[in-house]
Amino acid sequence: MKKAMALLLGFCVLLCSVGALAEPRADLVFTSATISLSSSGTCTFRATTYDEKNRIEITTVYLFKKTNGVWECICSLPRPTYVSSGFIYNAVMNYGDYMGDGMYRVQAMFNADGHEAYRYSNGVDF
């Protein structure tokens, strides 16, 4: 009986120690990846990664316009040419010339050594 109890206790300790190692993450590569769009059309792209990367970049950028309550992709935009390495990516582009009257947001694909993540900016009225 003591042997079975000791074995059960050891198994419980093992399960607890394995569970403590698990880290819940929404994304396995990016700590954060954000796009901020200002009322002047300036778009700031920021990303950080959990581990050091050889290449962090933006691969695609799209402009969305809200029409009758629905976001519609209206065109692709020039992507930032900046490529970083390490843990941090920061780039700024101005897309004001692509926006008329209405509410707009930007979608971009962040890429870190082949791992991709889509993100959307905040919506801004022009």
Which residues fall in each region the model found?
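Bacterial N-terminal signal peptides
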Residues: 8-16
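Sec-dependent signal peptide cleavage junction
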Residues: 15-31
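Structural beta-strand segments of beta-rich domains
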Residues: 39-45
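Solvent-exposed serine/threonine-rich low-complexity stretches and specific carbohydrate-binding patches
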Residues: 60-61, 70-86
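Surface-exposed, short loops/turns at beta-strand junctions within beta-sandwich domains
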Residues: 93-103
